Amino acid sequence: MLSPMKKVCSLVLFVSLLAGLEFPDLDLILIFILDHRSIITHGILIPLFLYRYLTKEGKQNLINKYLSKILTSKKIKNEILDYAYIGFLIGIAIHLCADLFPKAYIGYALIKLPFFISIGAPLSIAWMLGNIFFALKIAFTKLNEKDLKEKSKNLIFLAIMIIGIIYLIIDSNFVSKITLMVISFPIIWIYARKGYKIIKR
């Protein structure tokens, strides 16, 4: 049975996951600044740098400003930030699984640099695959560092898979997308867990 705090953290993870699913398409709202499939939103650059900034020593004033009235413990604030980061990265990874299988690698299917410069099909594929791997590796490693029972971790992973499949199945060419997910996610999950256990020893 999860404690109330762990239930809150799990909720934060899944809400952040849903936010991460939608985050890459933020470029559609900013289409006059960022072309669709912008390298800035279709990857882990923003969450990675934001998380590193917020977890730096002396850089937690933003967290304290918005959460101090609700949460008094620095440890709890950091836990919530960690779970939000984990969920957000996983959401981006699922979204990129969908983006890897367009009808054709032309136009909006390609990753764009600032100033609407396309990086081409091969680099677009490599970028998305690389970001899927690193997003999941970071997220799953951090999740396995958490003080949760193995059963709870496995249930969270199962829920992630179910959410991902539901998200992908409503899209076109869903068989290829789901196949990529059901192969890559468990492999990286196992890889992240084994790596964590080796470090822990």
Task: Identify what each model region corresponds to.
Residues 1-201:
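N-terminal membrane-targeting hydrophobic helices
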